[in-house]
Amino acid sequence: MEIPFGGAKGALAIDPRKWEITELEQITRRFTQELAKRDLISPSQNVPAPDMGTGEREMAWIADEYRRLNPTDLNAWACVTGKPLGKGGIAGRTEATGRGVQYALQEFFRHEKDVAKSGLTATLADKRI
């Protein structure tokens, strides 16, 4: 399929609820510095996206720090997805994963043989996902 994204994950083993916002920003920026130092973040490779415990705010901090570290990179803001609209984000990003699941399920139920193999009936009625 040659899809240009996917495959890498990174994390910090912290509980963000236990830190002040200013501390979280410092931690996130330092994490970005460490990723950059190891050439593990750029608009053309290892593009982070929000996940558990992160969102638009953290993605904006990462993008801003990456841009600060790479002032000549014209595509610096593209080093992460999931930024707020005001920082180059895309409308609908928050809903994108759920929408992808919706489309995948619709496509799955179009193929009766696959539905039969799965042991499901041809509808989502009364099912939990």
Describe these PLM feature segments:
Residues 127-129:
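Conserved class I S-adenosyl-L-methionine
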Residues 1-96, 100-104, 108-111:
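N-terminal ligand-binding/catalytic initiation module
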Residues 108-125:
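Inter-helical turn/loop segments and adjacent helix faces that build the functional surface
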